[in-house]
Each structure stands twice: as structure tokens, then as C-alpha cells.
A protein has these predicted regions:
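Sec-dependent signal peptide recognition
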Residues: 2-7
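Short cationic/low-complexity microdomains
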Residues: 107-127
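Edge beta-strand at a domain terminus
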Residues: 98, 103, 123-129, 133-148
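Short coil/loop residues immediately preceding or within conserved phosphate-binding loops
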Residues: 41, 116, 140
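Central antiparallel beta-sheet cores of small beta-barrel/beta-sandwich binding domains
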Residues: 30, 35-112
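Bacterial Sec-dependent signal peptides at the C-terminal "C-region" and cleavage site
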Residues: 8, 12-22
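N-terminal helix-cap/turn-to-beta initiation motif at the start of protein domains
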Residues: 18-32
């Protein structure tokens, strides 16, 4: 009887979805990240999670001329699942919902947005790769950042 109860409990636990990610679970993204290639540079700076939010800033340019900037924010959506809010050039934010994450990666999606529809971050040690793409992975563009 005890074995049957243990087996039933194990089956129930295996069938349960893991708890949803929290903003605090994305703290591995925090820091100052830089990418330099052929005179073009991009920086992303992420504050550590605090008060259930992460704030970020991205800027890029050539040599000493800034060409683009973007305000970034990760906070819980209405359902509690983290949402990545991107405000390119300071415009109104576009939301991307967290759809997958683990200890070193996070994928955010918004299938209704023109481009990008997917934003993915993957960290390995002091490197982090950010990739934007269409929802099917096409038209992908990636930046490999180093922690500074």
C-alpha cells in the first residue's frame, strides 16, 4: 500500500507544471554587457531585480556616435508572468511575454508584433547572447555581449 501511494504521488508530481518564473529568477541578466564588432558597438545595462522589476538600457553606435537607444523593463504581467517591455527610441513600450526560461536563458514572445516577435537571451559565464527573430526563428539577428 505504501508503495502504491508513493508511486501515485510521484506520478502526480511529474504531471505538474513547474512554478511560473518570477522577475527575480532573471537576475542572471543583470550587469553591464558590451558587444564590439567592426567599429560598431552595442551596450545593454540591466539593474538587478528589485521591487519585482528589472530596468535596462540599450544603446548602439559607430565609433563615438550613438545611433540607437532603447529603454527596457521586465515586470510581472497581469497574470504574474514576467513581461519584457521594449521602448525603442523612447517610444511607447511593446510587451513580450516570457514563454520559456531556466537558470541561464529566457525567451520572450509577442506574435502580434511586426518585428521582432521573439527576444532570447542565453548566458554562458561572462558572455551573453541576445537574439531577436520572427516567431518561427527566421530573420534572426544576434549580439554576443561580454560582461564589463
Amino acid at each position: 500500500m505504501k508503495r502504491l501511494l508513493a508511486a501515485a504521488t510521484a506520478l502526480l508530481l511529474m504531471g505538474q507544471a513547474p512554478p511560473p518564473a518570477r522577475v527575480a529568477d532573471l537576475g542572471w541578466m543583470s550587469g553591464r554587457w558590451e558587444s564590439d564588432s567592426a567599429g560598431r558597438w552595442t551596450e545593454e545595462i540591466w539593474a538587478a531585480p528589485r521591487a519585482n522589476a528589472m530596468l535596462g538600457l540599450s544603446r548602439s553606435g559607430r565609433e563615438e556616435v550613438m545611433r540607437e537607444f532603447e529603454y527596457l523593463r521586465i515586470q510581472p504581467g497581469d497574470d504574474g508572468i514576467p513581461v519584457y517591455l521594449a521602448s525603442p527610441g523612447g517610444r511607447a513600450p511593446t510587451p513580450f511575454r516570457l514563454v520559456a526560461s531556466d537558470a541561464t536563458s529566457a525567451t520572450f514572445e509577442n506574435p502580434q508584433h511586426d518585428f521582432p516577435q521573439r527576444i532570447r537571451y542565453v548566458r554562458t559565464g561572462d558572455s551573453m547572447v541576445a537574439t531577436i527573430s520572427a516567431i518561427d526563428g527566421s530573420n534572426a539577428m544576434s549580439w554576443t555581449f561580454q560582461r564589463r
